[in-house]
């Protein structure tokens, strides 16, 4: 892709990756992604905000060459992960006088990952500024969004926040700016769930800090630029809050139909009680969509058959991921079936040790669900409704 002007003197010089379909060998990328790097030309100095993934280094260098960028004074690295920093070693060769501007923790990780010499760094602290002449960069240290060394960079005169991974999302698009806020909301919510949700306690404070800034744009490291910052800031404020919604998410697997019959009955019972239900058959589920669904609900009910003596392996995987993502759910339960015994319920309950939930009485059946099983599911639906009413969310 060619470079594009964001505002006078500020340019997008990154790369689009329409074909990438997985990130960290874990996160599906149904819309591809972008690696956003930004060039800022001041009256005295030129700065580059982040680099791109090593697989796209030629696109970044080509953009800089096409723009006749003969000198870069500062390369600001907001985040040490290689999709942000991976082209840094090459750029330091091409621009031998460039100084890497970042915080001490990021310098430490960059040195470990990329072996960047100590003498190439200028270390900044929270609130420090850097003059480019007629433009000023201000830095905010924001650990655990989503690594411990993350920072944000604010261009004062143009009121642009280069927000690193915060407020962004994976999408490869030829549009420089967000054009469809409804679609952007869904992609950003998915990205938040996959990347940011485990750190919502820290992020809550950063959202409030950013809200106090005069902002014309938020320019993230992934996805198009946001010219209406209030849209994404309000969304984040909702996601990181402690409030939950009158929703139940049901991730499940059914090997011979028994667990699926239970899921269908429970789904109907919850809907009849005015509760929104989102079932996910894990054999066909995009794990990113499941993560997104976990942002809001008050309750999760896990459906599993028993494999040998424990839950189905795909249920184990989904439960492990949910535990790592630490959603703000308040209640959890387990439904499912077994042939001769096992400890599926106990195993799942132990796996949710990072999620502060009240475990509601499970419903397990030997073989096919019978009338007693269906009554147990109705009882579980009533228990969930009661708990939701206590939270005043019905």
Predicted segments — roles?
Residues 3-64, 152-155, 159-163, 259:
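Conserved beta-strand hairpin/beta-sheet module of binuclear metal-dependent hydrolase folds
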Residues 55-101:
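Active-site metal-binding motif and surrounding structural segment of the metallo-beta-lactamase
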